Amino acid sequence: MSVSKTLCAVSAVPEGGAITAHIESSTGGFDLVLTRKDGRISAFHNECPHAGRRLDWAPGEFLIENGLLICAAHGATFDIESGHCAGGPCRGVGLRSVPVEIVDGNVCLR
């Protein structure tokens, strides 16, 4: 049985919204965006594929409209469930997903 890293409680991720979670690594770590749509949690690197900028406009604050996460830097839009780019300068290149699972009411890295 493998041990997975707990990111947060499922209840911490608002329906139709997003939060950040930090992952420590030997290179200093990185931030994830955790989203929730219809109860399903998705996780992505907090980095726009267009220019490598963070997606949040302030730490942990995201612009989301009609199920689309909007990059604060250049306005690219991404589906909050799939990470697919719906419009903007990165059309056709989606967010890098990170596999997660729900364990005892917590979101964990898979």
Regions found by a protein language model. Name each.
Residues 76-77, 84:
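Short Gly/Pro-enriched loop/turn and capping motifs at secondary-structure junctions
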Residues 1-65, 79-80, 94-110:
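N-terminal pre-ligand scaffold of iron-sulfur
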Residues 48, 71-74:
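Short cysteine clusters
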Residues 62-71, 85-93:
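Short cysteine/histidine-rich metal-coordination sites, predominantly Zn2+-binding motifs
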